[in-house]
């Protein structure tokens, strides 16, 4: 692992976690870092904080969210993102994406780490 991505086991569920408040992915193309960490830990779950993601992730027109989510889906990795509810910079289209994602079980955005971990454990 690295100092930015670590395997954390809680309640029998192992997930790769990003370091809170630290940038991990500068671009969508760097999602391989998350996949490599998952493969090394033998897990299929990741918990990242909004600050770990590319700055434009929550602006759907950037393509970052789509590229990252598709790559993780291709490998069966579930992603939980912790983001304050009041955080700005979310496009209208991202809200539409979240409405669609609620019908799936491989991506979610949560207000707290505890909520994100509970979802990954479900």
Where do the model's predicted regions map?
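Amphipathic, Lys/Arg-enriched alpha-helical "gate/interface" segment within cytosolic domains
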Residues: 2-122
